[in-house]
Amino acid sequence: MSIANLARRVVRALTPYQSARRIGGKGHVWLNANEAPQAYPFTIEGNRLNRYPECQPAEVVNGYAAYAGVNPDQVLVSRGADEAIELLIRTFCEAGEDQILICPPTYGMYAISAETCGVGIVEQPLTACRQPDWPAIADRLSDVKLVFLCSPNNPTGDLVGRDGLIALLEKARNRAIIVVDEAYIEFCPKASVVDLLARFPNLVVTRTLSKAFALAGIRCGFTLASTEVIAMLAKVIAPYPIPDPIAQIAAQALSPMGLELMQERVAELNKQKALIKTALTALPCVREVFEDKGNFILVRFVDSAAVFAAMKAAGIILRDFSTKPGLENSIRITIGYQNKMDAVLAVLRDQPVSL
């Protein structure tokens, strides 16, 4: 008997999530993982490392609650938003019985987490306008425990319509939990739906420090929800999920100075995003530029394979989405500082008109 035969059936059949780092590649301009273009220095004190950390570091919880405009008992800190996704599925879904609903094309970890937990997946594709199909989702509420929506959506960059979300939350009361993934919300903060937590106990919002806060390397995420939901998740989360050095860095990032740095970074990246979007729309090798509410732009090219190969040859690593339904010939470009965006445009301007 092989070791593989000892593994759970769902794990043997599982195709792991193809993260940017797993896919890899060789280059010097990395624009494939929606990371911030620059790290910032933080200080760490090591005199507490002999002790286990707090399960939920108070300084981080209180800091994020103040930043997000919620009460501290509505916040759970986790190892990235990915752990928050998995915690929600493990907490609310029975393996082999329950299902989640996703709206592809969207972030892949919703499905991977469900598969790993032995939970079924209902796919309700986005509409032609790249919005959730609200009536179709409402019709499936009796079949699912959790509905995952990404706003801004990765990879298309679209925001979830607020009116449609409110109507769905009303219909889902006491039936299903609606999860809104706001990993990129700092790039369009007025579009946040956190304010709806006060009205809907079945709403959950997930957040992260990986994008606008430039802290992808520390894996720190947040769940914002009703106190009842948070209490349930707290039963399931590991006893010491946040290492003390991570908590120290997160607390500094959430300080007044840290928030100011984040907002300055977001303003600069949004500026670069507007500039490259304008430039992209004028290029003959570009067929469509998608919505741009995150720190990335999805672009449909005349021939994405040729563009991807040319970028790779130039040492520029992007993320290919051309195999995803409805995203034929599409590549996602992470927004960086001007020199990186100029490098991308230089390659595209050299592409033949008749690709």
From Swiss-Prot:
<keyword id="KW-0032">Aminotransferase</keyword>
<feature type="modified residue" description="N6-(pyridoxal phosphate)lysine">
    <location>
        <position position="211"/>
    </location>
</feature>
<keyword id="KW-0368">Histidine biosynthesis</keyword>
<comment type="pathway">
    <text>Amino-acid biosynthesis; L-histidine biosynthesis; L-histidine from 5-phospho-alpha-D-ribose 1-diphosphate: step 7/9.</text>
</comment>
<dbReference type="InterPro" id="IPR015424">
    <property type="entry name" value="PyrdxlP-dep_Trfase"/>
</dbReference>
<keyword id="KW-0028">Amino-acid biosynthesis</keyword>
<comment type="similarity">
    <text>Belongs to the class-II pyridoxal-phosphate-dependent aminotransferase family. Histidinol-phosphate aminotransferase subfamily.</text>
</comment>
<keyword id="KW-0663">Pyridoxal phosphate</keyword>
<dbReference type="GO" id="GO:0004400">
    <property type="term" value="F:histidinol-phosphate transaminase activity"/>
</dbReference>
<dbReference type="Pfam" id="PF00155">
    <property type="entry name" value="Aminotran_1_2"/>
</dbReference>
<keyword id="KW-0808">Transferase</keyword>
<dbReference type="GO" id="GO:0030170">
    <property type="term" value="F:pyridoxal phosphate binding"/>
</dbReference>
<protein>
    <recommendedName>
        <fullName>Histidinol-phosphate aminotransferase</fullName>
        <ecNumber>2.6.1.9</ecNumber>
    </recommendedName>
</protein>
<dbReference type="InterPro" id="IPR015421">
    <property type="entry name" value="PyrdxlP-dep_Trfase_major"/>
</dbReference>
<dbReference type="InterPro" id="IPR001917">
    <property type="entry name" value="Aminotrans_II_pyridoxalP_BS"/>
</dbReference>
<dbReference type="InterPro" id="IPR015422">
    <property type="entry name" value="PyrdxlP-dep_Trfase_small"/>
</dbReference>
<dbReference type="GO" id="GO:0000105">
    <property type="term" value="P:L-histidine biosynthetic process"/>
</dbReference>
<dbReference type="InterPro" id="IPR005861">
    <property type="entry name" value="HisP_aminotrans"/>
</dbReference>
<dbReference type="InterPro" id="IPR004839">
    <property type="entry name" value="Aminotransferase_I/II_large"/>
</dbReference>
<comment type="subunit">
    <text>Homodimer.</text>
</comment>
